[in-house]
Amino acid sequence: MKNVTTRRTALKTGLAATAAAVVPMDGAAAAPAPKAPGETKIVVMMGHDGMHNDVSYEMEIRSIFASKKDWRIWAARTNKVISPELIADADLIITQRFGDPYEWNAEGLADSVGSQRFSLYNDVMAPAMIANVRDRGMGWLAVHNTIWNGRKDLEDFIGVDAELHQEIQPVIYKQFNPEHPVTRGIEPFCVNLEEQFGVKIKNPAETTILFRSLAVHDHRDSVGGWCLERGKGRVIGLLPGHLEWCYRVEAYREVFWRAAFWAMRREIEPFPKSGNRDLW
């Protein structure tokens, strides 16, 4: 019985492997290892507040790109390690955080007195994110509540005005753009519990709609994904993402996979099917 895999041992193994790959927490802006020749650097900044589990998001995102052994993912579990230096040589950033300051990480003690709060979209990071996309060609996947960054410059850059979700409910994603390589051939799918954020496109002439969403209970129909060119770089907005389980929907995993390649201006490789991913 010593070698039998249980839910507990599987969780321990998975969490240990994920923790080993994370940016160190011991400094105000701890620097990752230098980018190796030929390596693809992806910086992931997801969850990180009282309602979203960033470690669970991180594990799902890592699993989508697990077959790409030369793609190195740096997942920031605390805003205090995020700096312009961290993304200065990144090929892609993936964000799923709103603009309010919040502080949480997977290590150490949680102190109710004197805790510091940091915002991802501060006056240093926001211009750096824009410049790296526009001037250097870094890709940006702006996921879910990234639209609530609270900054006019970032809202203009990703090309949308945010609309708040209503009831958390099943949401159908549909009308996938058959002309775009990120969504060509993708069939409609449903996420059983989702915040159906919406957006208003600021400049339709420069924006491509990738797909739409339909709320099952209140029937609100809205844009669910879009993309646009920004200087040397590209931005893709993907609104599904309230709970980590949406990243187990095979169709959305494929959209995410394709979006990463497209945002980095790379030829999109065939998506490796995931098979049975049920940890339980």
Where are these regions (language model features)?
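Extracellular ligand-binding/catalytic regions of CAZymes and related secreted enzymes
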Residues: P37-T40, S67, R77, H217, ...
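C-terminal segment of classical bacterial N-terminal signal peptides
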Residues: V23-G27
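Solvent-exposed loop/turn segments at secondary-structure junctions
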Residues: D49-M51, K80-V81, G99-Y102, T146-G150, ...
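Short alpha-beta junction capping motif
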Residues: M45-M46, I87-G150, K232
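N-terminal secretory signal peptides and thylakoid transit peptides that target proteins
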Residues: M1-T18
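An acidic, glycine-rich "communication" segment
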Residues: E58, A142-H219, P272-W280
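Short, surface-exposed beta-strand/loop micro-motifs that present aromatic residues
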Residues: G198, R220-E229
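Aromatic-Pro/Gly-enriched surface loop or interdomain linker
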Residues: A31-L92, S274-W280
